[in-house]
């Protein structure tokens, strides 16, 4: 829901790509720092309390991001927004692993599919509101209202407990947990590129108006959602390793299409391929973490989430730096090469 705001923030504050990338780094730092804490808090107070508190903080940040013109306040708000998002992501995955294991069924892709559905509704909805001439601030107030209504409906069904606290709040990942974390790192980096730079790419390099730039992330989120909603059946049919291999190849091809064919239609097609390719890699990785015995679950889930989200921490800033000294196209192609590495890694992972 925040992706369509990026071009407005860039334009309102007169930021170049390098500065924007550094500011987006604040969001990643907030996420990274909150995740180990979220795992410990979920173990102590339960998933429900932490998910409710983190979502409320997100709702407080969104209207500020739509209006801020002060650089220090923008930095602080991005940090808090990132920390809140990190709390939601980590705790939701803790709950998902618990539920999947208790059910004895393959469910992780479906859970992540609903997360992606929120990306579609948020990005496309905000883009639609902005295209009607509604101000960014008013659009965010509408989003906040709808989010709080949904939270009130969902909260009673969230788990009042988390994973048992069998270890420290954070431990350096090792063995298969580290390997899974590195795969997640690359995929999250690619997702961060779509979230933070897809709109800028469309407006700066493909001549798309700012009010429609959010469609880039909406297309990415749409194919990711479809892939995940059907992902549990796909994983059962072809196996976890093939899902990672084929997904990495598809996502790499998508970034190449978006970058090398200089029309906005090709960019949207490329974003669609990236979403489809990345859709089930991370869910498969989280399921694998729930089955591994190298590290306690209460430590392993926050650990791979933290390593994975380091991709979002490093990715936007690195892409902004490369775009500043060279080009955004080169930055996207580097990410494509990294996704080829994910495909290779998928053949080595024991799931």
Please provide the spans of the model-predicted regions.
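Short hydrophobic/small-residue motifs within alpha-helical transmembrane segments
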Residues: 28-29, 116-121, 221-222, 226, ...
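Cytoplasmic helix-loop-helix junction between adjacent transmembrane helices
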Residues: 78-113
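Helix-breaking motifs and short loop linkers at transmembrane-helix boundaries and internal kinks
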Residues: 14, 46, 67-72, 207, ...
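Primarily marks hydrophobic transmembrane alpha-helices of the MFS/SLC 12-helix fold
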Residues: 48-51, 244
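Helix-loop-helix hairpin linking two adjacent transmembrane segments in secondary transporters
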Residues: 110-159
